[in-house]
Each structure stands twice: as C-alpha cells, then as structure tokens.
Amino acid sequence: MLALHAETREPDMSHKQYDTLSNDTILQLAHRALVNYPACAQAEVRLLCRSENATLSVSTPQGRYALRIHRGDYHAKQDIESELLWLDALQAADISVPAAVEDRQGERIQVLPLPDGGERYAVLFHWIEGDMLTDSVDPAAFRQLGAITARLHHHSRKWQKPQGFRRIIWDHHTMVSPAGHWGDWRDVAGLPTAEHAVVEETLEHVRRQMLDFGQSPERYGLIHADLRLTNLLVHKGETRVIDFDDCGMGWYLHDLAAAISFVEHHPSAPQWVENWLRGYEQVAHISDRELAMIPAMLIQRRIQLTAWVASHRETEMARSLGDRWASHTVRLCQRYLEGAALPIGI
C-alpha cells in the first residue's frame, strides 16, 4: 500500500531518453517476467514495438496478453502503481482500459534486475481486442477521440486520488525547457541554429499565455497526455483507450494537442481538430477562454515532440518522420506568431 500523500514528480534529465537494451535482451527479460504467471508457462512471446517502453504480445492457450517492459530511469515503481490505480478507477466507471494481471504473489509490477546493477519494471495486461483507427480513415474518427477524452476528463476532475498517488508533471517547463522530460528541442536534426530564434520567440509567447491561463482544477489535472488515434481501439461499437504510460498532471487541453501528435503539419490537421472538438462537445463544454488557448497548446505540443524526436532519434518512430519534420516545426511556429487561428496544416 502506498503511504505518501498524492504528489507529482519532477524530471531527471541525467539519464538517456531511450532504452539501449537489445531486442534479444528485452525478450530474455520478458521470459523472466512471465515465469511469475502460471498461465504464461508455455507462452509464445513476440516483440510488437519499442518507444518509451517495449511492448510484447504474449499468446497462451488460455488467452492473449500484452507485456510492457519499461525503459530505465523514466517511471519509478510508485509512479507505475499510480497509473494502475487510475486504470482500476476508470474500469470501475465503465471506461474500457487495460487491466493489469496479478502474478502468483499478487503483485502487478515485476522488478527485473540487470547484470549492470540496474533494473527494469514490467507489467502484464489482459489483451484488449479492437481495431486501431488511423488518420487515413474518415475524419469523424476524431469525434470518437474527442468524446472519449471528455469522459476521461470528467472522471479525472471528480476522482479522489488515493494516498501515495504520484505521476509525472506536464507543464510548460517540463515539456519544452532544456531540462524537460524529453530533452532539448535544439538538439533535433535538421534545425539550423539560425532558426532557433523563431522557436524561442514562440515559446516565450506560449509561456506568458500558460502563466496567464493558470492551473486551476477545472483546467489542469490528471490527463492521458498521449491520447491519439493509435491509442484508441474500437470493438463492437465500444471505444477503448490504451497506453496510459505518459499519464500525468497537465492541462486538459493538452490532450487535444496530443491527438494530432507528429502530424500537426498534415493538410487535414485543422479538420481533425474541428472533429475532435465536436466530439468533445457532445460530452462536455469547452469555454471560450479554453478555446482561445488551443493555438498555444498545439504549438507547445509540437515543440515538445521536437525535443522527443531529438532525444529518441534511434527509435523507429523518430526515423520515420523524415528530414523535413524539424523545418515544418519552424513553419508552424511562424504561423503561430502571425496569429493563425490554428497553427497547423499546410
């Protein structure tokens, strides 16, 4: 049982932003973790993807599971347990999210020692069936995304966090400063030093806006923080949300900005945002004051992701973005400074 009062965690930027373990080592860790689950004794294990964490498919005669192996030095065990507590509460509120599996000792988090003295945490989840929506489908998919996000926000505002609840902080400093969780955007490939001034001017404008907007409980609280279409599944008409690894304390409107992560420069991005807002408004109201903050939220997220791309350059996701992604960031910053209603798209 966690014994501390609810709290938030500051970043530690002294560690690498990506996991240096090989795929073979990840698979070895997976098999070690699964020893603690009797149902997985004869499991077939397959690596699905690697980003902040490694996600593996675990197939058994009794059913399928997803095993998440955390990279080192990102979340402490207390933070992961807090994520699982929110998932428990969301399930109790009839929102379909991943459910962690207890091992033979009743534990939900495995601690896996490494030869160098380090360790990795692992969590086994029941597999969630569903079709993953993409930005190539009907833009109305973003209405579903907006609607389920509104339900999460409603729950977050009402939920009484248990003692010891602790999650990562997503504010302006931890997102886009040189000491942010994901590093310094200035380190991204393809961004000439001469163009830093445009981004810096943008961030100063955004910083002042965020300071004025404030962090009242109606505007700032526990959010998913990475709720895009790739983390939304639809099964038999039910909308299901996955991948809460980045959940933490942030502005609720940050979840809108996260909805178009990495594709803010896409020609359809404005249409996606409009559809997201329509879906959200079907469940909850967004005030005019909040609507006025959307441009700042969008460009802040894009710069945050620019830092992520810089610090995760070895990942498949970062490599897939191409050589012009950083230059698009500068172009969107210029649109923001010019007062564009939505600093996204072409």
Name what the model sees in each region.
Residues M1-Q105, K236, I344-I346:
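Conserved NTP-binding catalytic cores of kinases and kinase-like/nucleotidyltransferase enzymes
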Residues S14-Q17, L305-I346:
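ATP/Mg2+ or Mg2+-diphosphate-binding catalytic cores
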Residues E52-Q62, A66-L67, A100, R207-L253:
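Active-site acidic catalytic loop and adjacent metal/ATP-binding pocket
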Residues T60-K161:
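ATP-binding pocket architecture of kinase catalytic cores
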Residues G72, G130, T239, C247-M249, ...:
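Activation segment
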Residues G106, R120-D135, G180-G190, I303-S320:
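A glycine-centered beta->alpha junction motif in the catalytic cores
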Residues D135-A197, E218-Y220, R324:
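A cross-family kinase active-site recognition segment
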Residues Y252-H285, R301-M317:
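Active-site activation/catalytic loop segments of kinase-like enzymes and analogous catalytic loops
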